[in-house]
Amino acid sequence: MFKKKTVFVVGAGASKEVGLPVGDELKTAITGKLNIRFDDGYSQNSGDKKIVEALRLIVNERGERDINPLCQAGRIIASAMPQAISIDNFLHTHANDADIVLMGKLGIAASILEAERSSKICAKEGVINFAAHPHIWHNTFCKMLAENVQLGDLETIFDNVAFVTFNYDRCIEHFIAHWLENYFRISADHAQNLTKKLKVFHPYGQVGRLPWQGGGVSVGYGTELSSRTLPQIAGQIRTFTERVEDDAMLDEMRAYIANSEQIIYLGFSYGQMNMELLTIPTCSIYKSVFGTVFLMSAPNVTAVQNRVRMSLTTNTQNWVGRQEYLGAEANKLLNDYWYHLV
């Protein structure tokens, strides 16, 4: 169990450990789905068919029939992906183009739901095969969480832990609920109700709520993509511009960061837009910082250190105490610093 107030900041590299796409892979997947073209104007020969079905539903609800402007917006995104830092950056650039934003969200939603379905932690017949993938950070985190915990302690197991994930997937919530159920031999309902107590911020939204979470569009982890629910799921994804306008969520997220005693960055790229979202306005607690910098150059690691310090500086007062960065993946960082973190 974590004794210090801890915030985990999670990026795409962390979900990569369970088989979800990182930046370039996600851009490639989105390109394939949004490069929508037709032979003779009728027979679709490229792009995602379910997205096209969703477009027909969208324009029909608008009282229109022509999906070509939306398809064109999709092709614009597809052609620009090799130039983009990420799909998030591209949508931020074109935040005033409603068609591009809509198509980008549809591409993200379809790609992530498909990736969840093929991920290592997709529960086959309702059960995750924990033996097949013991060396993922999700498993190591749960072992740290459960260390010295007895059944009577379960209600407070998440008291000192929160997550900020910049990923659209639900890997964290999905895995933890299944892990608690199997390890502590409790019912699925009990495990899910416990996991509801874990604070998980999704600054850019998520591809639907898990059925047991309630609120919003309900989508099971690994569920087959439906063209009917895809527009609603896409509606739960937020661009950087939209998220900056969500004052209540940002205030709560930054309060958790400000009140933490340690911050652990896992598979995170430390991009400037995201660091801006993480920047705290006030603070009174010095923090230990641990982060992965897998495959980063020495100059970029120095820049990362500066960006983190800036995000944790208020009125010229810096609140970073110890800083440790490891050129490895998330699971190795948790294992190597286990005794320092719990």
Predicted segments — roles?
Residues 9-12, 35, 141, 154:
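Terminal, non-catalytic protein-protein interaction segments that mediate quaternary/complex assembly
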Residues 16-19, 171-174, 208-212, 272-275:
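Short catalytic/ligand-binding loop motif for oxyanion handling, primarily in non-cytosolic enzymes
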Residues 201, 214-251:
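Flexible internal linker/loop segments at domain or repeat junctions
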Residues 197-212:
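Short, conserved secondary-structure transition motifs
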Residues 2, 45-198, 250, 254, ...:
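Active-site periphery "cap/insert" segments of enzyme catalytic domains
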Residues 1-18, 23-29, 33, 41-49, ...:
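SIR2/sirtuin-family catalytic core signature
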Residues 190-193, 207-210, 340-342:
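Acidic, low-complexity terminal tails and accessory targeting/binding regions
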Residues 13-14, 145, 165-170, 204-207, ...:
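Short, flexible loop/turn elements at secondary-structure junctions
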